């Protein structure tokens, strides 16, 4: 089996995490997984949604979008169509769920964190890149809140989280699929994990033929290997 990119089965794409990419948001990152590029920002606002008022905890919510020409052909802006598509809603809910799992909301205070992930160039794995980059932006936003005198209840961060795609391509488990592989893969999994080794979410779909338990185990093992490398890259970015 030869991957279109020339990578071996357990090899990630080149990953870059650039912090403080924009000047206004409390946390901002440009994350690059190969040719996939996503700008992730975290904005801090006082107050919480109505359903959380008086409960003594904060909130985090996420939005996701793609520039019209982030793909090979221009896509119409969802705003011009008057509503978000099902894929967009699914992805932004995944991003929000994943990042909330990293936080103890009771220590956040009366604050809402708005996470925005905007894909400027897509080559597969946009949702996993978004989660990975937004986690670093979230860390920077928490540091800003603390500097402003917040987080008096302690650090709300329970652990880091990251995400990566794995799949079955030409009968073999492969790590971090690009668009060409994703389009031809027999199975595609998106895996979200904590730095402590726990799973937050596993999304999997077979195309054409079911995948077997041994395939699933092989893909999870690859995801765990890749995730360990990604956590190291996140920590290196935060240390700069």
UniProtKB/Swiss-Prot annotation:
Any one GO BP annotation for this protein: rRNA processing
GO MF annotation list: 3'-5'-RNA exonuclease activity; tRNA binding; tRNA nucleotidyltransferase activity
Keywords from the named record: Nucleotidyltransferase, RNA-binding, rRNA processing, Transferase, tRNA processing, tRNA-binding
Assembly description: Homohexameric ring arranged as a trimer of dimers.
Enzyme Commission no: 2.7.7.56
Protein name: Ribonuclease PH
First-tier enzyme category under EC: transferase
Recorded name of the encoding gene: rph
NCBIfam families: RNasePH
Function: Phosphorolytic 3'-5' exoribonuclease that plays an important role in tRNA 3'-end maturation. Removes nucleotide residues following the 3'-CCA terminus of tRNAs; can also add nucleotides to the ends of RNA molecules by using nucleoside diphosphates as substrates, but this may not be physiologically important. Probably plays a role in initiation of 16S rRNA degradation (leading to ribosome degradation) during starvation.
Catalysis: reaction(s): tRNA(n+1) + phosphate = tRNA(n) + a ribonucleoside 5'-diphosphate
Positions with a binding annotation for phosphate: 87, 125-127
TM regions (residue ranges): none
Family: Belongs to the RNase PH family.
């Amino acid at each position: 089996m030869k991957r279109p990119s020339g990578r071996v089965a357990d090899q990630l794409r080149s990953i870059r995490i650039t912090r403080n990419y924009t000047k206004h948001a409390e946390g901002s990152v440009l994350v690059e997984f190969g040719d996939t590029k996503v700008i992730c920002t975290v904005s801090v606002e006082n107050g919480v949604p109505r359903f959380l008022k008086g409960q003594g905890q904060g909130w985090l919510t996420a939005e996701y979008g793609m520039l019209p020409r982030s793909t090979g052909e221009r896509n119409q802006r969802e705003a011009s169509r008057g509503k978000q598509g099902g894929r967009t809603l699914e992805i932004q809910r995944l991003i929000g769920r994943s990042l909330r799992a990293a936080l103890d909301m009771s220590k956040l205070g009366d604050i809402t964190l708005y996470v925005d992930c905007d894909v400027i160039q897509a080559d597969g794995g946009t949702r996993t890149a978004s989660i990975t980059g937004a986690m670093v932006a979230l860390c920077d936003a928490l540091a800003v809140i603390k500097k402003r005198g917040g987080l008096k209840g302690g650090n709300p961060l329970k652990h880091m989280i990251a995400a990566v795609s794995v799949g079955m391509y030409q009968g073999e488990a492969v790590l971090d699929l690009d668009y060409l592989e994703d389009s031809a893969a027999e199975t595609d999994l998106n895996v979200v994990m904590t730095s402590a080794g726990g799973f937050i979410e596993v999304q999997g779909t077979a195309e054409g033929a079911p995948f077997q338990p041994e395939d699933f185990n092989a893909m999870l093992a690859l995801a765990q290997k890749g995730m360990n490398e990604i956590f190291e890259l996140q920590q290196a970015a935060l240390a700069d």
